[in-house]
């Protein structure tokens, strides 16, 4: 679904993604200011960003995937959310690719768009969604490839889906 239906009432305006605003939902991935640790004979700078992706619950292991996303049209209807209760999920654009992330706090499934928050990246930022954080599927502003790290393991797919009783839309 790309277009907003006549039933979408609540309009979320995607706010610029910041670490502070996104903290209840996970972690923002961005190149820090300043210099990292020199590696490769001084030809590269290394920045260690996050060392606990929380992917090992119930025997899980990291899975690196590539999502090739089409650009979405905005405003975009938000009527369905999903979560991964057993592990985090990471989205990193490969290149300068903006995307919108619509989220709700972990816990009970959201029932209304009023319970959601929306953020737009600057094209160079990624996010790590904390385990159990409700989120909309990837909403690429700019078409392109995204590296996705998520939990793989026994027990089937770690994905719960809910439909909002009161859907809404997100706009840039």
Language model features by range: what are they?
Residues 120-134:
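Conserved metal-binding segment of the jelly-roll/cupin
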